[in-house]
């Protein structure tokens, strides 16, 4: 997952779409128990009821991209219908925010090293 920053938004909404934020909060809330994509999809649509509906494919794509990024863990179980992934958060909310800050700063230091160091030294 490539982080895209929208500074017009606040908090996690700077880097996540609304349904993605809801999905992560759900996984943080269940605290390591893990959830299938179906569980996450149902919870996201319950939480966003009246606003919009999110497709299960969008949830699966997001969860898999977060696994690829190293933000989520998964285990595979075999059940009715074949194999399915059970997703769990690798980081809690604070650790995820640190991860986002680290990724952003790493890229700023790579592309604008002098300017980034100067600005960081001025920030109090």
What are these regions (language model features)?
Residues 1-25, 30, 34, 92:
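Short alpha-helical segments that sit at the start of domains
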Residues 15, 32, 51-54, 69:
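Helix-turn-helix/winged-helix DNA-binding modules
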Residues 33-45:
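Short acidic, hydrophobic short linear motifs in intrinsically disordered regions
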Residues 45-59:
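Short, positively charged loop/turn segments that connect secondary-structure elements
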Residues 60-64:
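Short, hydrophobic-biased segments on the C-terminal half of alpha helices
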Residues 67-77:
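A short, conserved structural fragment
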Residues 77-98:
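Short, cationic-aromatic polyanion-contact patches
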Residues 94-124:
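Amphipathic alpha-helical dimerization/coiled-coil segments
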